[in-house]
Amino acid sequence: MKFLLLSTFIFLYSSLALARDKHYFIGITEAVWDYASGTEEKKLISVDTEQSNFYLQNGPDRIGRKYKKALYFEYTDGTFSKTIDKPAWLGFLGPVIKAEVEDKVYVHLKNLASRIYTFHAHGVTYTKEYEGAVYPDNTTDFQRADDKVLPGQQYVYVLHANEPSPGEGDSNCVTRIYHSHVDAPKDIASGLIGPLILCKKGSLYKEKEKNIDQEFVLMFSVVDENLSWYLEDNIKTFCSEPEKVDKDNEDFQESNRMYSINGYTFGSLPGLSMCAADRVKWYLFGMGNEVDVHSAFFHGQALTSRNYQTDIINLFPATLIDAYMVAQNPGVWMLSCQNLNHLKAGLQAFFQVRDCNKPSPEDNIQDRHVRHYYIAAEEVIWNYAPSGTDIFTGENLTALESDSRVFFEQGATRIGGSYKKMAYREYTDGSFTNRKQRGPDEEHLGILGPVIWAEVGDTIKVTFHNKGQHPLSIQPMGVSFTAENEGTYYGPPGRSSQQAASHVAPKETFTYEWTVPKEMGPTYADPVCLSKMYYSGVDPTKDIFTGLIGPMKICKKGSLLADGRQKDVDKEFYLFPTVFDENESLLLDDNIRMFTTAPDQVDKEDEDFQESNKMHSMNGFMYGNQPGLNMCLGESIVWYLFSAGNEADVHGIYFSGNTYLSKGERRDTANLFPHKSLTLLMNPDTKGTFDVECLTTDHYTGGMKQKYTVNQCQRQFEDFTVYLGERTYYVAAVEVEWDYSPSRAWEKELHHLQEQNVSNVFLDKEEFFIGSKYKKVVYRQFTDSSFREQVKRRAEDEHLGILGPPIHANVGDKVKVVFKNMATRPYSIHAHGVKTESSTVVPTLPGEVRTYTWQIPERSGAGREDSACIPWAYYSTVDRVKDLYSGLIGPLIVCRKSYVKVFSPKKKMEFFLLFLVFDENESWYLDDNIKTYSEHPEKVNKDNEEFLESNKMHAINGKMFGNLQGLTMHVKDEVNWYVMGMGNEIDLHTVHFHGHSFQYKHRGVYSSDVFDLFPGTYQTLEMFPQTPGTWLLHCHVTDHVHAGMATTYTVLPVEQETKSG
């Protein structure tokens, strides 16, 4: 250990001789925080007083808006007697810590609170004794002192700002964070979190970034006060009858979740003010739990982030991102989270753009076009599946035992598959008498409004006529407008009159005028056209779910034909995947009256009734009923994707049979979140009928899946790829007993170090739970076609865990997988990204052997700006959901031709990580597992919520709580981490590496120590380990941390050649 430390010190001090020393004196203090200090009347979006009172009003069993918290404060010096004022907008966040590359930062921490806390920094380099995180890491004595700073004690943390943060493609200064890490989720919920800004060498002048006028740091978080260490104190202090409080009551718990920005909720965040034409830098991060799916929307502004144009920034727990904006359009604007549940719960703030007579950037565009649209909102009867059939199974949608029955069955208290909705429809002129007929190319649009398109420099005029029964509007994204033309109504105190633009009454008409200045258009890195959307913003939640949404595309100057189609593109498709929540529709009561046979018996609060109205659709179509997704072999296709909704709307839209290019990367699955939009470029090279579907398991079974067809048309299309290399793998599906947690030692030591005594619902058997062992089926490699001898996994493969064998291929190869089904039910093997002869994956019956052939053309390999090797997943598709959760998944790695020989004389270390909550309730073997492993199988109720929860195994490669072994490397190794995400709505995983940053490529090289994973995300992360030690690797989502989605990786000093393991 002494040798290990000595080598670490020599390395750090030799490389940092030129460092600048910076000192911060930070105290942890307990204080009462008010989440909504400004109580003046504001007009917020989708919020009524009843909703705000639910969170802000205290009472007999309600805490209200004030909570005792522990917060980081900055002091002038080591006496800790005088605090330094911070900007009002920082809220309860700790002080901003700033460093340039090569700086050395000393954080003098004093704990003035009543319990142990620490200081753990993201994105910087530190040795083990400055990590500030509690977990079993084989350290002793002085290396443990950083793990717990007791009340009244002090500790100095020494941090080094090193390459690779920020990365070459990053902005000059990037967002990082620091927080306490005894029990990180509880410490953060108690208030201990702050921003750390890391900058490239020479980019700061007097502690401000050069060429930036204003900077702001924003944390979007649903702060869960139920997890705070001070919950008991807060109940005693702020509830008028504390003895009546039931801490397990769902309403009580929800009232303590504060939907806030920097600790301010319901529009009370102060101090966001700037001049028009100011160059503004936003440092943004998310924090929290599965509910923390945020879409930060800067109304009226254009931002660039990672060189792409945007007005929405998606944030998840520990997502770290920055954005640049030139403030425009003087006025008071809304900064909101467009997750519709968060909008209703008060996650909104105002920012002011003042007119300070600063010269604004010149817009020197000649010959402006005015594009005029005539759009009405009108009622329609909408059928989510006009054929009455599940196109995937051929069955009637109401067939017994079918997944679709719950949504399409009509009856006494069920609406069925048809709903009265509102839709935007286009007319020829302002008389609104002749509706424009949709052509065959527009058939796929479905419920969506007409496409509004424009080029940079254009003016858009939309004459909107409301034929409905409620006030409605049109709120665009991706264009510039004045406050008088905004379709969302909100306002600071004192602005009370309803504006015409944001409140078009029934039978009224309003003409909107929007412009497309240069900064709203695509950047050099963007595609030719940007996918955007428009929707009704009177009450976005109700209006969007009623059907009022449509696509927009904003394109580079001169890129469109007269009819709006993009030059050099054969076909354009618009896809809007969302869970239409008809319970939130403006017309719910009409639908109950019209379509149920006993409307007076309907209980709108009944969970089953609500579930039956959640329509998992694309453009308003379910189970393959979307028409018009037809194209020709070899055509140039653009897909414009966009979404809206809430935290359930985490989508992985998978195009089987083909890949696309987006942001320089080659992919086949696009991740979408509320209000996010994407442009995908595809050249289909295989004819047949393929699936476009959401990989999020509940969405897939719920009907969010369609078919697209690639035809051989007149145009001759030849695939000239010559597949020279041939690789054969012998893989079998084998049933095994799988133990998610063979040793409880790491978990027990963790809880001992945290001084917590916690039971474990996932691993403890108790009376009738299954425990940690389950029968599963896994892919395993064999030596030859006799399938007699399984390939023994080497030390470097130990970390694979449940994963099948890594299948490696280069572009131009043909991979033959000889697959034997040694299990007891039919399975198959199907890979993402590859080309196959047929669009059908044939199941292999028990005992059978079948050969699956995968071709690896150019479009299966890395894009121009990708890493040289990129991961895809392979899995069984007989029943996508049950096969996956039963255990069948593995990695496929595709490298550029001859990459290894040319680029890398030194072999890279490779590690494969699958972050997945294995839902054992969905496994084929659930009944077997109850029989075999439950102490009292006869007592098991498979619908019991606690039983269901106990079978959700939060695992990395199928292992929990430090049980994933074999992640061992040396200083100076080059390491590729191939990370994969699959699963359901809860499978948003923010993967955090302690001790090291990594690099990844998105049209440029970026650096971070947290990467966001979703169902269908496959990504290469490159790491160059430099600090020896055993380091934590975990998901940063609160529930996932507590449920055991964590392990460690070990970096050995360069001289110490020992066996890994």
From Swiss-Prot:
Na(+) 3 binds at F762, G771, Y774, S950. Na(+) 2 binds at F407, G416, Y419, S612. Na(+) 1 binds at Y55, G64, Y67, S255. Binds 6 Cu(2+) cations per monomer. It comes from the Eukaryota. Gene3D superfamilies: Cupredoxins - blue copper proteins. InterPro entries: Ceruloplasmin-like_CuRO_5, Cu-oxidase-like_N, Cu-oxidase_2nd, Cu-oxidase_C, Cu-oxidase_fam, Cu_oxidase_CS, Cu_oxidase_Cu_BS, Cupredoxin. O2 binds at H120, H179, H992, H994, H1036. Its EC number is 1.16.3.4, 1.16.3.1, 1.11.1.9, 1.11.1.27. Cu(2+) 4 binds at H294, C337, H342. GO terms for biological process: CAMKK-AMPK signaling cascade; fatty acid oxidation; gene expression; glucose homeostasis; inflammatory response; intracellular copper ion homeostasis; intracellular iron ion homeostasis; lipid catabolic process. Cu(2+) 2 binds at H122, H179, H1036. Cu(2+) 5 binds at H651, C694, H699, M704. Residues 1-19 form the signal peptide. It is found in: Secreted. The active site is at C694. PROSITE patterns: MULTICOPPER_OXIDASE1 (PS00079), MULTICOPPER_OXIDASE2 (PS00080). Its cofactor is Cu(2+). Disulfide bonds join C173-C199, C275-C356, C529-C555, C632-C713, C869-C895. The keyword Isomerase does not apply. Multifunctional blue, copper-binding (6-7 atoms per molecule) glycoprotein. It has ferroxidase activity oxidizing Fe(2+) to Fe(3+) without releasing radical oxygen species. It is involved in iron transport across the cell membrane. Copper ions provide a large number of enzymatic activites. Oxidizes highly toxic ferrous ions to the ferric state for further incorporation onto apo-transferrins, catalyzes Cu(+) oxidation and promotes the oxidation of biogenic amines such as norepinephrin and serotonin. Found in a complex with MPO and LTF; interacts directly with MPO and LTF, which allows Fe(3+) incorporation into LTF, activation of CP ferroxidase activity and protection of CP antioxidant properties by MPO. This is Ceruloplasmin. It comes from Mus musculus (Mouse). The lineage of its organism: Eukaryota, Metazoa, Chordata, Craniata, Vertebrata. The gene is Cp.
